[in-house]
């Protein structure tokens, strides 16, 4: 079970069933072959129509409630951006005479998600941070019914850190996350009921790490960790990151990312346009974009694909404390999904879609990003022998 649901065991002597299906097809009895396959080969179904396969879902939501912004009318010059050269997402806006900036990135070397908020001007940062796993059922996509996915968890807040520990209800997979809120010397951090509050700060850094006891190893697919061992593992990563400055965390991330990303530079004669990406897309579709703008959008899309691969598929890493960090390959939605019922459940379609994810990996000099797929296929050999013997 890579996600909720799980790898249910076989339903019987499928070898004999396959022989009967072949005979039906050979005799032109297609409907009988299909009926037998649906009744004997397909896994046990649930109310989501997933045949017991399960699906990836979002971890949850982080809420950052800015206390000094009451409505959209309070801010001006609002922009959002993603810098493909650094893999850093940014938000910038002005409120009165104060400029607010927010940077977000996911660091592979430090195994944390980092949010950094600054205020430059007369106003100071005042906000609440909370984290909540998502138990919503989601909406039907591609004709698939609502998710029955549920989980239970406990949340504690201490010393500016939000700790969440829980378990999935259907396959008992454990999960844990920790979020540390840090301010500059001028700021005040206060623990609350399920949240951390900040006031009077010019700079805030939010560091999050998370983990589960999943391990891609037949037959248990579990690390064997106790709940406390999993919690300690997640805590270690946040502790290690929290003693570093934001600039150190950012430099680690950018250096690691660019070592792969900068290996390929595509030049199609593009020029940098002052238009926003959505404006470029509209002009491209309408046929009003210049040749240089069309080339810019095409190069951007090419590099965006490489960015997504680097950010969702990295090789196994052994950290300084001996923790081995394994990574599953990117699924049909990559890795970062903001919904609890994504198309195709963010699963792995072995027929061609999974391979398509990795087509550019080797040809654009990102071989290490292909290792999770190789490891995943290798891990299928042992259960595959069991299937072949049925």
Task: State what each model feature region is.
Residues 1-390:
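Aromatic-residue-lined binding/catalytic grooves and analogous aromatic/hydrophobic interfacial grooves
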């Amino acid at each position: 079970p890579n996600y909720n649901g799980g790898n249910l065991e076989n339903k019987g002597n499928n070898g004999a069933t396959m022989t009967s299906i072949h005979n039906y097809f050979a005799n032109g009895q297609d409907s009988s072959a299909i009926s037998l396959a649906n009744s004997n080969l397909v896994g046990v179904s649930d109310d989501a129509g997933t045949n017991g396969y399960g699906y990836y879902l979002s971890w949850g939501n982080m809420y950052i409630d800015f206390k000094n912004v009451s409505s959209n009318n309070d801010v001006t010059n609002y922009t959002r951006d993603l810098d493909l050269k650094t893999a850093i997402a940014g938000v910038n806006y002005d409120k009165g005479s104060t400029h607010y900036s927010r940077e977000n990135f996911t660091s592979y070397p430090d195994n944390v998600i980092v949010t950094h908020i600054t205020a430059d001007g007369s106003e100071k940062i005042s906000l609440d941070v909370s984290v909540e796993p998502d138990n919503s059922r989601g909406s039907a996509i591609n004709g698939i019914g609502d998710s029955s996915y549920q989980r239970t968890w406990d949340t504690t807040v201490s010393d500016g850190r939000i700790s969440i520990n829980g378990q999935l209800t259907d396959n008992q997979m454990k999960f844990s996350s920790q979020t540390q809120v840090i301010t500059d010397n001028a700021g005040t951090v206060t623990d609350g009921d399920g949240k951390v509050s900040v006031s009077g700060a010019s700079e805030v850094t939010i560091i999050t790490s998370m983990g589960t006891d999943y391990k891609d190893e037949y037959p248990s697919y579990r690390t064997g960790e106790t709940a406390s061992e999993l919690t300690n593992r997640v805590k270690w990563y946040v502790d290690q990151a929290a003693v570093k400055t934001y600039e150190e965390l950012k430099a680690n991330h950018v250096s690691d990312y660019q070592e792969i990303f900068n290996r390929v530079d595509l030049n199609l004669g593009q020029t940098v346009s002052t238009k926003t990406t959505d404006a470029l897309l509209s002009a491209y579709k309408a046929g009003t974009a210049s040749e240089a703008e069309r080339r810019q959008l095409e190069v951007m899309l090419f590099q965006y694909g490489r960015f997504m691969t680097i950010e969702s598929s990295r090789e196994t890493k052994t950290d300084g404390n001996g923790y081995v960090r394994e990574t599953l390959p990117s699924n049909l939605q990559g890795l970062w999904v903001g919904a609890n019922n994504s198309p195709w459940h963010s699963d792995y379609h072995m027929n061609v879609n999974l391979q398509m994810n990795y087509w550019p990996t080797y040809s654009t000099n990102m071989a290490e990003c292909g290792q999770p797929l190789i490891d995943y296929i290798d891990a299928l050999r042992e259960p595959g022998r069991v299937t072949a013997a049925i």
